[in-house]
Amino acid sequence: MSQSAEIPYLLRAARGEVLDRPPVWMMRQAGRYMKVYRDLRDKYPSFRERSENADLAIEISLQPWRAFQPDGVIMFSDILTPLPGIGIPFDIIESKGPIIDPPIRTQQQIDHLHPFDPDQTVPFVKTILKTLRQEVGNQSTVLGFVGAPWTLAAYAVEGKSSKTYSIIKSMAFSEPAILHQLLSKLADMVASYVRYQIDCGAQVVQMFDSWAGQLTPQDYDVFALPYQQQVVRQVKETHPDTPLILYISGSAGVLERMGKSGVDMISVDWTVDMAEARQRLGKEMKVQGNIDPGVLFGSQSFIRDRIVDTIRKAGNQGHILNLGHGVLVGTPEDNVRFFFETAKNADQLLVHA
């Protein structure tokens, strides 16, 4: 077996190799659109149990692997999972989302946050990642994932999901010193968590700054970018060769700024044309994405055309095919299967198209 054949396909793309087709996986590929997941959810209704019980999280992570054989298998978890480990408890209410009560809004609360010890507070992550590596071998790449400091702070300060982010923006624009302390502590936690995931078996780690797209570009430069950089800098000091991906929803206005974070790859959302994203980010930056999740509700010929279009625009080096957001609830499983089958035969499509 050649050395390149021993390296998982997605990892080769993340390292910048020229490939016949891009590797493919989907954000939220394990989730509610799959009947096997819904059946398991009915039996175990607590999201935290599903994501923090290692056996359940392993099973859920592997459901799309068994069904579709994606080139990437991502750990089933939540971006808030590490927060209790520094003193921010949370719960997840089905159909309502995360709740943090009390929310973090005072200097005293921030002073009481403590350093993150993943072995003590998230030991199940080690079991999940080590088992996933054993299960998929070199046939797929195991991805870890974390939330970025701004997005974690948004949940912690707001206390829940928000449409306006008025509470954290009030803190940012009236008491910035307090928020900067929180962001720095969260960045240290995230960096420690990324390193832990890599040590436990993650071969690539994606950082989600889901709500950074709610910031103006000038505020992104103050409250999001420096803390993304803090995470990346700390991780690269100890794990320089592990590819890091950054994803932001609604990122068209800050795309170039994302490239300054220090990550190896930018996951582009569907609001930016992939050819434009390539141009704006520069040829050295690798990209992931960026098909509109709504495309998976379309006809098979439409799905096929969008796959080919995206691959052509991204080029044959440094691209991972993905959606521009997570798989939507209600997406037909047959269309997801068709998406993966088509993507994995894209080299043939590109020759004949």
UniProtKB/Swiss-Prot annotation:
Binding site for substrate: R28, Q29, A30, G31, R32, D78, Y155, S210, H325
Principal location class: cytoplasm
Assigned keywords, A-Z: Cytoplasm, Decarboxylase, Lyase, Porphyrin biosynthesis
Pathway of action: Porphyrin-containing compound metabolism; protoporphyrin-IX biosynthesis; coproporphyrinogen-III from 5-aminolevulinate: step 4/4
Cross-referenced InterPro entries: UROD/MetE-like_sf, Uroporphyrinogen_deCO2ase_HemE, Uroporphyrinogen_deCOase
Site (Transition state stabilizer): D78
GO molecular function: uroporphyrinogen decarboxylase activity
Keyword hit for Lyase: yes
UniProt-listed Pfam families: URO-D
Keyword Repeat attributed: no
EC number: 4.1.1.37
Example of a GO cellular component annotation carried by this entry: cytoplasm
Catalytic activity, reaction form: uroporphyrinogen III + 4 H(+) = coproporphyrinogen III + 4 CO2
CDD domains linked: URO-D
GO biological process terms, semicolon-separated: protoporphyrinogen IX biosynthetic process
NCBIfam families to which the protein is assigned, alphabetical: hemE
Described purpose of this protein according to its UniProt entry: Catalyzes the decarboxylation of four acetate groups of uroporphyrinogen-III to yield coproporphyrinogen-III.
Subunit structure as annotated in this protein's UniProt entry: Homodimer.
Record PANTHER family: METHYLTETRAHYDROFOLATE:HOMOCYSTEINE METHYLTRANSFERASE RELATED, UROPORPHYRINOGEN DECARBOXYLASE
Protein name, UniProt field: Uroporphyrinogen decarboxylase
Source species: Gloeothece citriformis (strain PCC 7424) (Cyanothece sp. (strain PCC 7424))
